Structure formats: C-alpha cells, structure tokens
Amino acid sequence: MGFTIGGIRELGSGSRRRDRAAGSTFVAEYTGRWGWAVRPGARARTGTCSCGDRRCDAPGAHPLESAREVPAGASPDVAACAWADVPGASMMLPVGRAFDILEVAEAAGRRALVRLERMGLPLGPVAVTPDGRAQFFVAPGAAAQLPELLYRMGWDDAPLDLRALGPGTHITAPPCDLGGLGPVRWLRPPAPGTAAAPPPARLLLGTLAYSCHRT
C-alpha cells in the first residue's frame, strides 16, 4: 500500500483517506510512543515544492512554516486532528530536543552499525535517506560537542564525511519522501529505552569516524 505521507504516492480519494489515517497513525506513534515532536513538512511535486515558493532551495525537505507542530506525548486523537489540517504533508522531526544526529555516508554507516552491534554498545535509531546518508540518533548536545570530541579522539585533522545536526534543524521521518528522491527508511528502528534516551555521541563517534576514514 502506498502512502501519501510526504507525497510518496498519489492515489484515488478512497486510498487518500486511508493514507491520511495511516499518516496520523505514524504521527501518533512518534509523539506518543517514542516521545518525539513532529512538524508537518513540505513535499516535492514534479520538481517544485508544495510550499509554493518557486525559488525554494529545499523542495520537499523542510517544515511548513504555517503548520502547527504536534508536541511530544500527543494522544492519537490530537495527532489525528492536527494531521487532518495538513493532508499529504511529510513528517519532520525537530533535532536538538530528544536527540541530535550524527550523519555519515550510508556505506560508512552500515559498516559502523555492524561493528557497534558486535561490540554490544547501546544504540539509538538509525535512518537512511534516499540520497545515501545514514543518520544516527544520539543524545542532545552532540552538535555542540562534536569538535571537542573529535579533537580528543585524534580525528580533528582527518577529512571525514561526518557531521552533526542539532537545534534548529529537522530531519525527514520514515517512511516519508525526501525531496522527491524516495522514502527515508529505518536501518535500525526505534525501540523502547533508546528512542527517547539515545546514547551519548562519544560512544559511537570513534567507530563512525574510523568507518568514514576507510571509505
């Protein structure tokens, strides 16, 4: 079944009604079960952005300014009511509250994830984007701490394809479309205990940096 969440697929009116219900279900899961706020996001349509700005520099990959955020902890009824006002919107997760993001190339992220799992380290969710990025959910504060952490680990001078996302940024939530390129997917889905309290960046950073260096 296709989802109109994020403009993944446009179907008939009956399917759109079902997909709107599916959209609010995802929102309710993210807000109620995992403790994340959700913002309605724009979607890409035939090379343009649903925000209406013909010069939009991030079509289908940014929050809708006029749409209200669904707060963390919102009930299914609140989520359904909020999402009924933004049919077809994608789901955007605000970074810097419940989590920050360490982002690397997908190939490096997949290698690092295998190693981290073998080491038995605590891990939060990991998403992969259609443009080949892996996003590791880590404790808030990672974006501010990243330069110092890399320095302490001896990676500050290495040319690494690694960046941190923090307050003021958003990521597209699975299974929404990202900029018309395809859906974002879970490489490691949210789980109780780590979704709302992901591990500190320092536990993952050394392995991620090493994997990036090898790429």
Language model: regions and residue ranges:
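Signature for HUH/AEP ssDNA processing cores
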Residues: G2-D131, G141, P192-T215
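Catalytic core of tubulin tyrosine ligase-like
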Residues: F136
